């Protein structure tokens, strides 16, 4: 005789279905979060490079970008102060042993040399490509 209640079998069935659905949704969320962290860091790198270029023209000082493979970070600075430091260690890794500095000219914001910088994550490889001339760059996913 059942009066306004559920049997143990019905409760176990509902709990099993609920836990199965929860488990199936957690794994895609974790991979989505790591992808979002990568994209956010790449956008932050883009923004800091644009900021360095704009700062060079606005303050009439040469601005430098330095990628440090040993500390795995990006630093933008002028002769007098550090503008931005972005640590890459949690999400992206620089794969080249020596990269060097890039300089944005104070007259027109052009960059002094062209190069490709390789970044790797747990799932993707990226190339940060600096083009010679007006300081243009792009990020490509391999």
Where in the sequence are the language-model features?
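Phosphate-interacting basic helix/loop segments used at nucleotide- and nucleic-acid interfaces
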Residues: 46-51
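N-terminal single-pass transmembrane signal-anchor helix
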Residues: 1-29
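Membrane-proximal amphipathic alpha-helices
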Residues: 34-45
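N-terminal helix-rich module
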Residues: 24, 28-31, 39, 54, ...
């Amino acid at each position: 005789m059942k009066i306004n209640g559920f049997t143990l079998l019905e409760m176990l069935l509902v709990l099993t279905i609920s836990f199965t659905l929860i488990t199936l949704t957690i794994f895609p969320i974790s991979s989505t979060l790591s992808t979002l962290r990568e994209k956010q860091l790449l956008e932050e790198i883009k923004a800091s490079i644009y900021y360095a270029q704009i700062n060079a023209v606005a303050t009439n000082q040469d601005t430098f970008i330095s990628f440090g493979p040993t500390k795995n970070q990006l630093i933008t600075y002028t002769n007098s102060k550090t503008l931005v430091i972005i640590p890459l260690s949690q999400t992206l890794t620089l794969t080249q042993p020596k990269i060097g500095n890039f300089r944005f000219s104070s007259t027109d914001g052009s960059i002094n040399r062209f190069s490709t910088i390789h970044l790797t994550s747990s799932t993707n490889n990226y190339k940060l490509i600096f083009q010679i001339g007006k300081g243009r760059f792009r990020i490509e996913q391999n």
